[in-house]
Amino acid sequence: NGEKAVTEPKLLTKTSFPASVSPLLGSICWDQSAPYNNTCPLYQGERCVTGCVATAMAMILKYHEYPVKGKGTHSYKAPNGIECSFDYGNTTFDWNNMLPQYSGTYTAEQSDAVAQLMSACGVAVDMQYSPYSSGAYSYQVGQALIDYFGYDGNLELVYRQYFTSAEWMNLIKSEINEKRPIYYFGSSDDGGHAFVFDGYD
């Protein structure tokens, strides 16, 4: 399932790929502040940012423009007291009104569409919201996509440490050549960041 990490490399038989793949996301380039966080909770009077985990998820969902509607509901209370909930089953995602970028002018419908998606992603992974840095655990992303967004139950979380460098690059190139942008997370002693792999050269 989406929570279980793959600890044994699959046999990847394809080793020949195109020299480069242009970014699958095209011009989609989203951020964590307004308008993306317009429906994120307030904390001590300040609007919280979306968090990199939610932003990375949202860009991939926009790429697929799936689902039309979510599934179920989810709610939680964060350690800082913020209570969050989202009704996925009664939410229709307005893909057509989501812009690739939000620089310049845009309508209320366009800002509402992307803000709704960002909130849906954040709540699905129990985002710990704050005005300056919102965080969530990446291991929750896979199961959230399955449970609330209806993605394939065979979706997998894989860890770099269980693969050789060649196997890892092979896996990344395989996914990208199948036109599947990759949710990716990296961390060090100083912190971590989630982002999207959508091409290579």
Features from the language model and the residues they span:
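Active-site-adjacent substructure of cysteine-protease-like catalytic cores
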Residues: 143-201
